């Protein structure tokens, strides 16, 4: 007598034989078999296949429900169908007949069966990523299930980030967090902080790729709020690019005042605000000028020197000011100062260890190295700045030369290295012309300047550095005549910047009754200077005033050098030179005709061509070639 299993198998085979040719007969066999053997999986599954092949969604759903309820843990065929069903639900936009069947059949399943299918799939899947996708699918279909199941999903995401951080971070921020943001689950502080750090890392990569940074910061602040809710933190402020950063800082200070030492809440709020301010600083350091991206570099500003010795050079304990030299200076200074505030808070004993670990986990190394160098300059920590500069490998030689020059100015005197940096800067001037800057010098207070890397600004800074070193020599006894002329040449960039210095130079010229002819005929093109020199010349009717000339600083004869080559020449208001007045007028007319020349180019050439003489002025270095001697 055949066994029950043999009878079941016989009936299934008969139904399978007739399934294509006579579905009704096949169904009759299955109905009879189900009546005789209601607990037989093969019969129940064959009944489902008949309904599936006939595209009977509702009847297929009934059969599938019975199988899924009664035979959860037993048969491979069932799990294959469940996988096909969940794959179709995850890709509902696909229009294949197979996908369409599963999607429509799913709608006829009871909610309880639907939910159980998801949970059984999650519990029996060995693939972590597959389980995560089923969780996401279940939360989309059953939003309330996230209340109890989200912690488990978030733990799985955190685990997956150890091996594939990019993939699991994207799933977290783009798929999971939006589903739980309205009612975040409670999590352990460690897990919530790990998830926030991973989200922050994901969005920072977007920001560094220069995608839509406003959206990225909006999402970062949103994730911060979600993770804060998970840990029961006092809410921070939502992101708005129109909110002044002072508002965020004041909110942070308010939270800090009511929090215990080393609070994770303050740590993460302050870290977020620090990175936000740091990004604003780094982003604004690059500005579009004349169709070119121009970087701004933080450098030491010039302090006006007074011969009266009013104590203005006594170092102040106050932090330096920021000069408003460009339109972007206010934004840059605010972002920098807010980043500095947060940095100082986060490097106190209560936060330093955890903050350092956070910084190691985030892709911020280029920003941090730039910021720390600028911070060292800001606080006047020259030794630290030098050490940090040695660790910065990505900057250009132009920027490095500018920063070394700035460090020279910070210490109050220019070294030979600083002067060599000026020559290197002038040899690497960019093509972007730019404009001259205002407020490069302040009286009585150390200040910082955000210098754009344009031709005009760089030459202006180099000229200012030389003048700041030489200007006080004008008030010393026995100042060389040549020095007076060279400073006048440099002052053409901004003649009104130091009226007292200009007056002192002209007073000395009047007293000594001489000026260098080559300096006048080669480098002086400013109308005001030419008029003043003409006035001095024309006013010397009785006393002789001489213009003297000799070989230039490189030893090469100029147009005004006599045929003898190295012989000095002089013309005066009276004496042997009969055509002196006509020659002087010709020289001044020639220079006036040049008044529209590019003074930036003129002064860059002057410094390059006369660098040996300038070095002698600054350092007292003996010239290896003949110098111009003024009577």
From Swiss-Prot:
GO cellular component, one term: nucleus
GO BP terms in the entry: RNA polymerase II transcription initiation surveillance; snRNA processing
SUPFAM superfamilies: ARM repeat
Nucleus among keywords: yes
Domain of life of the source: Eukaryota
Region (Disordered): 545-577
InterPro entries listed in its UniProt record: ARM-type_fold, Int_cplx_su10
Keywords: Nucleus
Cellular localization per UniProt: Nucleus
Keyword match Nucleus: yes
Feature: compositional bias, Polar residues: 545-570
Major site of localization recorded for this protein: nucleus
Known function: Component of the integrator complex, a multiprotein complex that terminates RNA polymerase II (Pol II) transcription in the promoter-proximal region of genes. The integrator complex provides a quality checkpoint during transcription elongation by driving premature transcription termination of transcripts that are unfavorably configured for transcriptional elongation: the complex terminates transcription by (1) catalyzing dephosphorylation of the C-terminal domain (CTD) of Pol II subunit Polr2A/Rbp1 and Spt5, and (2) degrading the exiting nascent RNA transcript via endonuclease activity.
Subunit-structure text: Belongs to the multiprotein complex Integrator, at least composed of IntS1, IntS2, IntS3, IntS4, omd/IntS5, IntS6, defl/IntS7, IntS8, IntS9, IntS10, IntS11, IntS12, asun/IntS13, IntS14 and IntS15. The core complex associates with protein phosphatase 2A subunits mts/PP2A and Pp2A-29B, to form the Integrator-PP2A (INTAC) complex.
Family, per entry: Belongs to the Integrator subunit 10 family.
Protein name: Integrator complex subunit 10
Native organism: Drosophila melanogaster (Fruit fly)
Lineage per the UniProt record: Eukaryota, Metazoa, Ecdysozoa, Arthropoda, Hexapoda
Gene: IntS10
